[in-house]
Amino acid sequence: MSDTKNLNHDRQKALDNAISQIEKAFGRGAIMKLKQGAIEKIDSIPTGSIALDTALGIGGFPKGRIIEIFGPESSGKTTLALHVIAESQKKGGNCAFIDAEHALDIMYARKLGVNTGDLIVSQPDTGEQALHIVEYLICSGAIDVIVVDSVAALTPRAEIEGDMGDQHMGLQARLLSHALRKLTSIVSKANCILIFINQIRMKIGVVYGNPETTTGGNALKFYSSVRLDIRKVSAIKDKDVIIGNQTKVKVVKNKVAPPFKQVDFDIMYNEGISKVGEIIDMGVKLNIVEKAGSYYSYNSVRLGQGKENAKLYLKNNPSTADEIEQKIRASLQASDNDVSCFNAEVDSISDMDVPVF
């Protein structure tokens, strides 16, 4: 028994000496023990959607992590990223938008609540330049959210300087892989959120399984803590005029909470994510708002016939909307963030949706 104690004592002493040497070589904090009090709750920034914040498990995008938002064209990828910027700015955060596509609509960003006067915008000429700018901003330690729009537009310098028909196999994937190896650690230390918007391509010759894939190789799939698949489900019409889109978002990878949650919300033109529409949808799911046929009511007060009329009522009565929202948040908190109503169907999870850890 005494021999065992002596052995354990010697092992512990050797470990303490090793830790001491590591701290002398690399500084305090380079290595530590995760004691009971050392584990803290992951800080987050809201996405602008109550349902998506709940599905993510921690109330929004985790700080100090890399996020990927991908989907087809005009599905709401940039809109969601701009909402995150707006939410961060409300808390006094500094945000940057790396517009590699050279297509940022400043007027639309303002309508979503972005303070464009304080927004840092860059329109880089090459992929290398864009990623260097991202690195410098993160290393400043003063940035909270950086959005790169998009990965597909991060064109390597060799491709730009070459002829139009030249083949450059894997250049972009190698560029992104090299950059992410450097960025992943400094993003964590700076406690900022780095959001990559990505496009979808089709794999040639795929007979079985999902032919869709994202650009930039596999590195971003591995380094991302959260990956969101955003899709346009249907058009929202006012008579014959399309005024928005019903959007579906699936959390296909999540390192901070259980993945495979799925949410729906409305994205209205010139407005962004419809908060009142989401309040109605979640209120119905949680039995806070009553729905009988096409009529919506709350506390025996009829909100309107049809969802658009109910949304109009809540816009004109913000106190009622706030009251319903508070009840929704309280209900979700009381159920310990039980988001079983947002679970995606197993059959709908495609090959591309399987998370990469």
UniProtKB/Swiss-Prot annotation:
PROSITE patterns hit by this protein:
RECA_1, RECA_2, RECA_3
- Top-rank taxon, per record: Bacteria
Record's keyword annotation contains ATP-binding? yes
**One Pfam match, by short name?**
RecA_C
Q: Which keywords annotate this record?
A: ATP-binding, Cytoplasm, DNA damage, DNA recombination, DNA repair, DNA-binding, Nucleotide-binding, SOS response
Name the residues that bind ATP: G71, P72, E73, S74, S75, G76, K77, T78
Q: Does the keyword rRNA-binding apply?
A: no
- Where, per UniProt, does this protein localize? Cytoplasm
Q: Which InterPro entries match?
A: AAA+_ATPase (IPR003593), DNA_recomb/repair_RecA (IPR013765), DNA_recomb/repair_RecA_CS (IPR020584), P-loop_NTPase (IPR027417), RecA-like_C (IPR049261), RecA-like_N (IPR049428), RecA_ATP-bd (IPR020588), RecA_C_sf (IPR023400)
Record's Gene Ontology CC terms?
cytosol
Secretion signal: which residues?
A: none
Please name the SUPFAM superfamilies in this protein's record: P-loop containing nucleoside triphosphate hydrolases (SSF52540), RecA protein, C-terminal domain (SSF54752)
Q: Name one GO molecular function term.
A: ATP binding
Q: Which GO terms describe its biological process?
A: DNA recombination; DNA repair; SOS response
Function per UniProt: Can catalyze the hydrolysis of ATP in the presence of single-stranded DNA, the ATP-dependent uptake of single-stranded DNA by duplex DNA, and the ATP-dependent hybridization of homologous single-stranded DNAs. It interacts with LexA causing its activation and leading to its autocatalytic cleavage.
Tell me its family.
Belongs to the RecA family.
Indicate what this protein is called per its UniProt record: Protein RecA
